Amino acid sequence: IRIWGEFTEDPMATLAQLISDLGCETGKVGIEFSYLPTSDFQKLHALLPKADFIAADKIFDDLRQIKTPEETELLHRLSRISDTAIGASFDAVTPGMTEMDIASALTRSVYEQGAQDFKLMIVATGPRSELPNVGPTNRILEEGDICRVEIFSVINGYHAGVCRTASVGDPPKKASEIWANLVE
């Protein structure tokens, strides 16, 4: 493991030095081109002009699918955090609240349970519940509104998300019919 000082050192120079230290400066070097910005690759290529850079995106993607037991447990924990946070936010829902109130309860619960961050928070209610990937607004919740909430909890760069749907009070007839068809 090599560490570079963020904002004070060039990570590509550190990587080039590591590759050289391993004796690979004239060999094949697998690069995740779909992730590495072009400007960074150009720096790396200039620092290692004799290296044969090859696309290794598929290899990295395949390796990410393999999880250690510790990684699997962390993903389970993150899923539980996300699920519990959504449950806590739904428990707090009452007519007259706003979507922002739901978001506040959601994020508070995520952090209280030990997550370091969250990603892709969706809070959509009423007519907005049909829209994809929308964040919370100051829309006021009404009796019978459908609430769609999704959040990804994050620890050490690992993400796990959960999406749930509920209603404010009793659901409208159409929502109950859709639910009945889904569980049939």
Annotate the PLM regions:
Residues 1-184:
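Active-site neighborhoods and metal-handling regions in enzymes and metal-associated proteins
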